[in-house]
Structure formats: structure tokens, C-alpha cells
Amino acid sequence: MIFVTLLMLSSCEKEESVILDLNISPDEISRIELRADHKTLVPNGVCKMGFHTFVYAKKNVMSYGRDEETREFYGKEIEEEFLVPADQIPDGYVKVYDQIGNVLEDGYYATMSDVPGTVLQFYAKGGNLESNSLEVTIRELPKEDYEEIVIPVVFHVLVPPATATPSYDLSVEFLEEQLQRVSDAFNRKITTDPNAGNAKVVFKLATYDQNGLKMQEPGKNIENISVSDFTNMGTSSNKTKPYLSYILAKWKRLIWDPNKYLNIWLAKFTTSTSTTGTSTSYQMWPPRVMHPDYDLASIPGLDWEHKESFNLDDVEDCREVGFMVNLAALYTPTAVQGSNEFSLATPMAEYFGILQTRCDMYKYLNEDGDSDYCPDTYSFDYGFYPSVFKANNLDGQPENDPTRPLEYFTSFNVMDMYSYKNSLSVDQVKRLRMVLQQCPSRWAYKSDWAFTGGN
């Protein structure tokens, strides 16, 4: 066994111990911590609650420091507790149990029989050590008797001149795969999220263009930018505004009727990177118009105005009826956002009125105490947890606040950073369906033109 203690030579720094060899035996394990994916579970037999164990051990190690008064170095033996890597724990040593002592196979729990409102208890055990107990509340089965809707999508691929930059193209198969994954995430097809909803929304490539002609390549409209137009965009590596202006200027070719199509523009509009991706991976606006039959306050968190319809003549910015995606992010999900991999499902959800779950400061949360008006999603400070495993503590949150207990969770949500991005929650689905029903600029699904050409 080799233990090394790092000494910070600065006189004001306190000693720091680092254990490099973590091989342990069961009798060295000091405690077991149990965490769950969430605190509520939908009892439909499909949603699953995953449990995760964290095993800690203690060892005596040599710690070296420097006396602040005498400036002399010293060494002493101290006891250190550390998180044991999973591959160092004996196989099968730690198991998760329900409240009547049944072992959870693979650490997951699903149910169709537990009554909504029931609070279940779970714990982990290894040897003679037992973890903390976790409570999971069975929630009401959500209303999911929605009529399935199909949203026709056209990708406008903005290609710069070959003399200016390397050209590019995307296959129809690639675009279909992108939309399929979005549909699967929205419809609870690829997740174990314990609170996943089923939006019953399917995205498909349009097969007819705006003139009613059969498209040679479904859902794909190529726009070859001329040398002069590309030159007019300037030499900056960030061409976000020039591209948006270009789309609006060429609206007859690049903005198809929002009552028939969802427009997505693909372009390498910037080489900048950011972990959030909200300006570098995509450019979009949330919905802004609501039909007068509905109360503007019915969908909180967005600035609304009443409008009976929304047509091409109403478009003042292309982002009112679509969004622009950076090709670099679509091709290589880590290229622009790093380990917070880009997913087309994120701007798609945002386009339909779903809000970001992250927040930067505790004091900026809304009156409901979260960031997105969806009670079954967690708000979190994304700077604290660059991982799918997170907690709800926020920058600026009072420590030990009894009204906001520390809760761990797992990120499945398409709006979470550092997430599996394979799910919408039940409450997010409810909000999305309200937007689809109430917002005229999001009514492309009401027309079958994109699939029939008007025939």
C-alpha cells in the first residue's frame, strides 16, 4: 500500500492528503451512501427509479505539514475517509433493498401496482453496514391520452462557396436519424427516467416543397451561397448576425410557410465554443404569440401577445418560425459544447416553449422556486456538477436551508446540461402540448401539405 500526502508549500495553505492506492478490504469500509435518480416515480411500469451506491473507506495515512509559527516541517499519521472507486469494491458486496427486504435487481425499481401517494423506503447494505434510507413517492399517472401529431421538418442547408471554405453536405439518412432521436426522447422511447412523459409528437422530414413539388431529397433544401453574398458577410469567425440577415433577405427560398413546416437552418455560423451552447450551437427564440382564446398567464415564463394566426407576412425574424443550428455541433456533439454534448432535442424543446433547467444564481429563480415552471424537474447550478449525477444546491443558496434540502438526482432531461438528454418530464410534456395547442406560430402539424403537396 502506498499513500502520498501532498504538501502545499505556501505558508497559509493547510495540509492536504491524497491517497493514490485505493485497494481495500470490506472491513475498511466506513459507510455507504445511497442516492436515487429522483424523489418521485411514475407507476406505469416503464419509468424506473435507479439507485446508486457510494462506498467510503478510512485508512491511516501520513500527513505532512508546516508549522505556521516555527516554519518547521512535520509528519503525522491521520485517518482519512475517501470515496472508493466502483472497481475496487468486491463484486456483489453492496446491494439495494426495498422496505420489505427484497433485493433490487440491477438497482432499479419499477411498478404498476403501487398506489399514487405511497411513500416507499429504500436502503443499501454491505456486510454489517447499512446506508441512509431514501424515500420515493409514487406520483399520479399522468394524462397521456393525447392525439399523436406529426410535425413536418425542412432542413435548409446553407452552403458557402467552395472557394471560401470547405464545402459540406448531409445525407437524408443522417437528418432522419437526428429527428428520430428527438422523437424518441420526446416520446419516452430511450430512457429510464422515473418521471419521463410521452408527448406523442413525431418529427418527420417533409416530402413536398412549398410549391407542392415532390422533393428529390426529403426534408433537405440546399442553399448555395454566392461568392458575393458570402463576401458581404465579412471576415469575422462569428457570422451569426450575417447568416440570420441572409435567411431573412432570401425568405422566399429559406423561410417556408410556418403553417406547413418547421424550419431548421444548418450553417457553420461561428467557430466559437461554449459549454451552454445557447448562442454557439444554436440560435432560437421561444414562442411569443398565443391565440386569443387562451389566457396569456396559462404558460408562464415567456413574453406573450395575443394573435389569431401567424403567417409568412408576420415574420420579422427567421427565429420566430424556426431555429438555426451550428453544423459543427450537429456533426460532432462535443465540438462546440465539450463534455456537455449537443443534442438537437434541446433547441427543439426550447422552440416549443420548454425552459432551461439550469440557473446561475439562486436569487434568480422564479416565484415557484425553480427555473422552468415544471415541478418535476430540478434546478441546479451547472458549474457545480459537470456530470449526469447532480444535486439541487445552487450558487448563493443559503447553507442548511430547511426549505430547500439537498437532494441528489440524475440528469436524463434534454434541457439539462451534462445529461443523457433522452427525456422530457411529465410536466414538461404537459407544457409542450399546451404550446402546440395555443400558439399559432407552432401549428405546422395542422397541415399535411408537406406530405401530400396539397393533393
Language model regions located:
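Surface-exposed, short loops/turns at beta-strand junctions within beta-sandwich domains
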Residues: 109-118
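Surface-exposed, flexible coil segments in extracellular/virion-facing regions
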Residues: 88-93, 97-110
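Solvent-exposed, low-complexity, repeat-rich "mucin-like" stalks and linkers
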Residues: 28-95
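Active-site-proximal segment of zinc-dependent metalloprotease catalytic domains
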Residues: 241-357
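Propeptide-to-catalytic entry region of secreted or membrane-anchored zinc metalloproteases
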Residues: 97, 109, 127-260, 269-270, ...
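Bacterial Sec-dependent N-terminal signal peptides
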Residues: 6-40
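The catalytic-center signature of Zn2+-dependent metalloproteases
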Residues: 323-424
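Append "Rare intracellular matches occur via the same short Y/T/C beta-strand/loop motifs
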Residues: 118-126
